[in-house]
């Protein structure tokens, strides 16, 4: 209902004390200015996104400040659907192949396995790179504990956004600070937006 009435920055219709008023405040969230319907092998889906945030993420990849990898259940549709929609260059962003979209093998375990594999890879490097993992479903304290057990050679930042608004402005500032200098961060840290809600089950595409 909040999205139908304009989403972020359009909260005048909400009563004082309604938690959605703070959640969808433009001081907390990026306005979801992108709104398109996309076709996939699983049907049509309405996608809302922040052009501002997508542009800043792409710029980090273009400048070489970050390696930007898709780790999503949208895996089969990243390069031919999501990248063009967001204005991203598939030659710059990479899609991680982490589950079988036909059999769904590894769908419930593959994301964490890929992150842990990357942590092990960085441990073998002379100049290990820090890792940022953003996921609204799988960045939990239990995952944090498993990653910590690997004793990462460079800091790992786990970010769990509220799925209703995506990465918040505060979380984006944290990510940028981490990318600028991760030396002051713990071995593994988990940031959860204060408004997140627990899912009854794995959602995804």
Where are these regions (language model features)?
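Alpha-helical substrate-recognition element adjacent to the catalytic core
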Residues: 1-103
């Amino acid at each position: 209902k909040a999205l139908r009435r304009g989403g972020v920055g359009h909260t005048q219709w909400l009563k004082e004390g309604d938690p959605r008023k703070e959640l969808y405040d433009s001081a907390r969230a990026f306005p979801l200015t992108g709104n398109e319907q996309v076709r996939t092998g699983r049907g049509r889906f309405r996608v809302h996104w922040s052009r501002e945030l997508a542009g800043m993420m792409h710029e980090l990849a273009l400048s070489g400040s970050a390696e930007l990898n898709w780790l999503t259940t949208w895996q089969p549709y990243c390069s031919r659907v999501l990248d063009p929609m967001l204005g991203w260059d598939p030659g710059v962003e990479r899609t991680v192949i982490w589950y079988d979209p036909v059999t769904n093998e590894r769908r419930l375990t593959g994301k964490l396995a890929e992150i842990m594999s990357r942590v092990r890879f960085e441990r073998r490097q002379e100049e290990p790179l820090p890792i940022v993992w953003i996921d609204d479903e799988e960045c939990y304290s239990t995952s944090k504990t498993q990653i910590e057990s690997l004793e990462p050679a460079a800091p790992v930042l786990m970010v769990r956004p509220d799925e209703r608004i995506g990465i918040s402005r505060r979380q984006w500032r944290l990510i940028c600070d981490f990318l600028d200098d991760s030396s002051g961060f713990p071995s593994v840290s988990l940031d959860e937006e204060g408004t997140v809600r627990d899912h009854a089950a794995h959602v995804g595409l």
